[in-house]
Amino acid sequence: MKDGMRVGERFTHDFVVPPHKTVRHLYPESPEFAEFPEVFATGFMVGLMEWACVRAMAPYLEPGEGSLGTAICVTHTAATPPGLTVTVTAELRSVEGRRLSWRVSAHDGVDEIGSGTHERAVIHLEKFNAKVRQKTPAG
């Protein structure tokens, strides 16, 4: 990872919630999820928070590097219908070697809809993918 990321730096990422990012679409094979209202799913909100951190880190990664989420602790406090723009703010809290910790929050233009912390680890993609291949039946 290149130098330059500074604790306290903030990055924002906007996303217009489409109908296919609602609770019903998180696990479409689940009859239980089909009963939920058409609102932005917590699982998709978590993914959006990760995406903001990934984008913030991208300019600092060396060729062959990537990052993976290693921890997430967030609350989802308000419902967001499709069509609203969710803005995620990611603030870098710490850098410890290859581990980065973020404070994340999401706002839909009306309410803060979620907040918490997220951690990511910088990985060597080739090495990581080799380990994953060892876990597959074809190995």
Swiss-Prot record:
Recorded catalytic activity of this chain's protein: fluoroacetyl-CoA + H2O = fluoroacetate + CoA + H(+)
Database matches in InterPro entries: FlK (IPR025540), FlK-like_dom (IPR054485), HotDog_dom_sf (IPR029069)
Signal sequence interval, chain numbering: none
Key words, A-Z: Hydrolase
Effect of L26A: Reduced activity
MF-aspect GO terms: acyl-CoA hydrolase activity; protein homodimerization activity
Presence of keyword Hydrolase: yes
Domain of life: Bacteria
UniProt cross-references to Pfam families, sorted A to Z: FlK
Function comment: Hydrolyzes fluoroacetyl-CoA before it can react with citrate synthase, and thus confers fluoroacetate resistance. Cannot use acetyl-CoA as substrate.
Subunit (UniProt): Homodimer.
The protein's name in its UniProt record: Fluoroacetyl-CoA thioesterase
Annotated gene: flK
